[in-house]
From Swiss-Prot:
Nucleus in keyword set: no
InterPro entries on file: AtC3H46-like_PABC-like, AtC3H46-like_RRM, Nucleotide-bd_a/b_plait_sf, RBD_domain_sf, RRM_dom, Znf_CCCH, Znf_CCCH_sf
UniProt name for this protein: Zinc finger CCCH domain-containing protein 53
Biased composition (Low complexity): 100-110
Species for this entry: Oryza sativa subsp. japonica
Length: 682
């Protein structure tokens, strides 16, 4: 018997046992492609073996078992399983919410108890499904005397995605209506995704976090399937952005047909959504019950429940957008049906996008300063046009502007189209569109000169609008529906003028700030000129020295010169400015060639401490000389100078009396310019 005849025999036997699903079961067996020997074995095998194969196929395809007298019992299934001594179960999908059974790996020599955690997660749920679990253990010899391989497996790491894609033709519409797959629970027919790794740790393809896929239980059939089993099937790839099949795709592109909304029962759709939510929650709880599973920490793939919910939310959002567009058209036209859209009770999900841009829902009000209305009055007045969200009027003594925020942007368009003025409590109120700070287009920016500095970000009022109203908004509102181009030009012209005024104001502010900076600089200079010089003032010391030398003998002046010269000689390394200041300050004569005006330092930034030190040292003995002259005379003055230097009195820079040489051999008179011969004065 060849493979063709064996296939015909197997198909006839399957059709006799399950006529409803015979074609699908036979197609599944042919897809497995296990060779001619397996088909001949099924054709001549016992009926219990064929029942196990059919149960296996039903389980893979998600079909309900046919109830009839031919359904085998668990004893027959066990006998069929005992036909092969070597039993190695294949990985299969199971039903959610049931506990996995341990793998039975048996051999003729060892019949040890099976381990608890196994690579087979076949499910036994009652006596009617025990034969399904035993059917997983069907094996047959491969290539003669080689090791046994599963009938449905071959390679245990077979790609299940390719298998499910090959099964897609079994769910086409070409099958008779009587053989259509009825509505069933989606959670019991789809393969577990990555999130179900807690229950299915070693399933085929799931250990790598692969997505669950079951073409026989598509999302379109679960969510939108009709009573006849056909239903509308929106293309999920097209909803994501691209479908490679194009117009040849067997799913619907671009939404549902027009009559779909009428046929869909809203209560049934809502009930399906609730079922999906409950089922997905139970799956997450089941996955959390096994935290040490190899795939328990992997992210779950999008399940059928998530896809169905996102599809329903997308359709609801499209319906809300169409209703909102119809409401805007009715409000703009002012027809009889406008009152239907005035008071929508709550915000839809799509309205949050408009809330992100509050400028589209706000208007700017200007009114006289002597107005007496309150925020409640403004809210009550504008609630005629639509629901008001907020009213803000600054708390000022002379208030002249305010802001009104509406719930929907269509209300703002309706009020602006009506035009001005509005009267609230006998006060004339002008309505203007709310505009945020922005930039003028490039074609208007080119009108300014290149050298002109313009700052478009600044504005005269908190809203960027001037209090004046050069254009009548009533005419603008009338033209918005008829001549949109002219209205846009008018708005752009007004915006340009406002920003020009803002630029002029900015220039005036900068000019005023520059003037203030100039005044501050002048004030700073005057204060700096009036402040005392930080360096030591030589005039007081010089005048004291001049007064003292009038009473001292000439030798005391020579001694002062000599001591000052010695100090300058020892400190010559410190700079020429110190040497000159020391030499000049140590000459207390009133001669014309030794003027006091030469006591100025070379640098105006000299250190005040050093200059003060050198200004005090030459005159310290002079003060002692003044006190000594009144009591003892000139001779005591010399002794006082030497003793004061040797005892380390007031001046520690002077050398001791033993080391001090005679001052006269070291004194060299130098000619100086008098003050009247080019000396620099203050």
């Amino acid at each position: 018997m060849d493979a063709y005849e064996a296939t015909k025999v197997v198909f006839s036997r399957i059709q006799a046992l399950d006529p409803d699903h015979a074609a699908k079961i036979m197609g599944f067996l042919l897809i497995q492609d296990h060779g001619e020997k397996e088909m001949i074995r099924l054709a001549f095998g016992p009926e219990a073996l064929l029942h196990t194969v059919m149960a296996k196929a039903r389980k893979e395809l998600g079909l309900l078992p046919a109830s009839g007298p031919g359904t085998p019992t668990s004893v027959a299934a066990a006998a069929a399983a005992a036909h092969s001594p070597f039993m190695l179960s294949r990985q299969n999908s199971g039903r959610c919410g049931t506990a996995p059974s341990p793998l039975s790996v048996s051999s003729p020599s060892s019949w040890a108890p099976p381990p608890v955690f196994s690579r087979n997660n076949s499910i036994s749920n009652g006596a009617g499904e025990e034969m399904v679990g035993l059917g997983d253990e069907l094996i047959s010899p491969a290539n003669g005397g080689g090791p046994p391989s599963p009938f449905f497996g071959g390679d245990p790491l077979m790609d299940e995605l390719q298998l499910q894609d090959q099964l897609a033709f079994l769910n086409e519409g070409g099958v008779p209506a009587g053989h259509q797959m009825p509505m069933f629970d989606g959670g019991e027919c789809r393969s577990p995704g990555g999130g179900d790794g807690g229950l299915f740790s070693y399933n085929l393809g799931w250990a790598n976090g692969g997505p669950g896929h079951r073409r026989s239980a598509s999302v379109s059939e679960l969510c939108l399937g009709g009573a006849d089993g056909l239903g509308w099937k929106p293309c999920l790839y097209y909803a994501r952005g691209y479908c490679k099949n194009g117009s040849a795709c067997r799913f619907v592109h671009g939404g549902l047909p027009d009559d779909a909304a009428g046929k869909m029962d809203p209560s049934a759709v809502e009930q399906q959504c609730q079922d999906f939510l409950i089922r997905s929650k139970s799956q997450r709880l089941a996955a959390a019950a096994f935290p040490y599973s190899p795939t328990g920490s992997l992210p779950g793939s999008p399940s059928a429940a998530t896809k169905c919910l996102s599809l329903l939310l997308q359709q609801q959002q499209q319906q809300n957008e169409s209703q909102r567009a119809a409401a805007a058209a009715a409000l703009m036209l002012g027809g009889d049906e406008a009152h239907k859209f005035m008071g929508r009770p709550r915000l839809e999900r799509a309205d949050f996008a408009s809330m992100m841009n509050p400028g589209s829902r706000q208007i700017y009000l200007t009114f006289p300063a002597d107005s007496t209305f309150r925020e409640e009055d403004v809210s009550n007045y504008f609630s005629i046009y639509g629901p008001v969200h907020d009213v803000r009027i600054p708390y000022q003594q002379k208030r002249m502007f305010g802001f009104v925020t509406f719930v929907y942007p269509e209300t703002v368009k309706l009020i602006l189209a009506k035009g001005n003025p509005h009267f609230i409590c006998d006060a004339r109120v002008l309505v203007k569109p709310y505009k945020e700070k922005g930039k003028v287009p490039d074609k208007y920016r080119k009108q300014h000169q290149p050298g002109e500095r313009v700052d478009f970000s600044s504005c005269t009022t908190p809203t960027g609008l001037d209090a004046r109203d050069p254009f009548d908004m009533h005419q603008l509102g009338a033209r918005m529906l008829q001549h949109s181009n002219s209205a846009n030009e008018m708005l752009l012209r007004r915006k340009l003028e406002e920003q020009q005024q803002a630029a002029e104001l900015q220039q005036a502010i900068e000019l005023h700030s520059r003037r203030l900076m100039g005044l501050q600089l002048l004030d700073f200079k005057s204060r700096a000129a009036a402040a005392p010089t930080p360096i030591g003032n030589p005039f007081s010391a010089s005048q004291t020295a001049a007064n003292a030398t009038g009473e001292s003998p000439p030798d005391s002046g020579e001694l002062g010169k000599g001591s000052g010269f010695l100090l300058a000689h020892k400190k010559a390394v410190n700079g020429a400015d110190k040497e000159e200041s020391t030499g000049e300050s140590s000459s207390p004569n009133t001669d014309s060639d030794q003027s006091v005006e030469h006591n100025l330092p070379d640098s105006p930034f000299a250190s005040p401490t050093k200059s003060a030190g050198f200004a005090r040292d030459p005159f310290a003995p002079t003060e002692a000389e003044i006190s000594a002259t009144a009591s003892t005379g000139c001779s005591a003055t010399y002794v006082g100078i030497n003793n004061g230097a040797s005892n380390g009195g007031t001046n520690h820079l002077l050398p001791s009396a033993l080391d001090m040489p005679s001052p006269k051999p070291y004194f060299f008179p130098m000619s100086r310019l008098a003050s009247d011969h080019g000396a620099i004065g203050m």
